[in-house]
């Protein structure tokens, strides 16, 4: 039934219209306090984001995190959102306008080791555009089941070279974090922000830990609406959600 309804909406509204409707419904439902059990990290933002915070949302997609970050950091805070996919960026802009989010700057670029043009892809599974799984394509990746597009990539330390404050980074880039974070280290060293990362592979979890630990960062996982300390071994084997890193 769900697939049938989705199919009808896609045919009626088109992909951008469909994403706009779905994201609007999601934001209104979560803003009302529902779905906490399904999305604990999103609701946990209330405990770590303070008024006047400056935040970076890497992999902003259609704005689920940026919307909440914007509301929590307030009029004197700031959110820098990173979303290279034109389709998602368009829906992001719709949501930002609809919810009057005036403290967000959207950069329509990917982040990585070089300033260059890249190819990205979004899986299309059973005719469904899986927008949460968009990623930078490897040279040898089979793209027969992907919707592909060109995007611009920028070096994050250069992009954020002139900011004067940074309190929080959220990153969800489908495995590309190990290519991105080495080129964000100057910014991280300068401000020591709280970092929240979705990391799905064991090697990537280990690599990110080894990158941040020498900077004084400690790793944490979210359990029962609180952060629990993790050892490096815990991090490597962690599969319960996003990882958090912060200095103590």
PLM ranges: what are they?
Residues 1-248:
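Phosphate/nucleotide-binding beta-alpha loop and adjacent structural elements of enzyme active sites
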């Amino acid at each position: 039934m769900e697939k049938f309804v989705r199919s009808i909406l896609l045919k009626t509204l088109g992909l951008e219209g469909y994403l706009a409707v779905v994201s609007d419904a999601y934001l209104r439902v979560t803003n009302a306090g529902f779905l906490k059990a399904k999305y604990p990290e999103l609701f946990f933002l209330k405990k770590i984001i303070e008024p006047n915070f400056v935040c970076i949302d890497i992999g902003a997609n259609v704005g689920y995190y940026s919307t909440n970050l914007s509301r929590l950091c307030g009029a004197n805070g700031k959110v820098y959102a990173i979303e290279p996919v034109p389709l998602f960026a368009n829906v992001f802009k719709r949501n930002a306008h609809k919810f009057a989010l005036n403290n967000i700057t959207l950069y329509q670029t990917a982040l990585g080791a070089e300033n260059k043009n890249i190819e990205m892809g979004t899986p299309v599974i059973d005719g469904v555009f899986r927008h949460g799984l968009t990623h930078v394509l490897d040279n040898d990746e089979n793209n027969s089941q992907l919707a592909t597009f060109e995007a611009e990539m920028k070096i994050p330390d250069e992009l954020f070279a002139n900011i004067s404050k940074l309190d929080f980074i959220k990153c969800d880039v489908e495995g590309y974090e190990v290519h991105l974070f080495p080129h964000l280290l100057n910014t991280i060293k300068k401000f020591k922000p709280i970092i929240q990362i979705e990391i799905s592979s064991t090697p990537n979890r280990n690599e990110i830990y080894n990158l941040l630990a020498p900077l004084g960062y400690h790793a944490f996982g979210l359990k029962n609406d609180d952060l629990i300390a993790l050892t490096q071994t815990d991090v490597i084997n962690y599969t319960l959600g996003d990882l958090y890193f912060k200095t103590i």
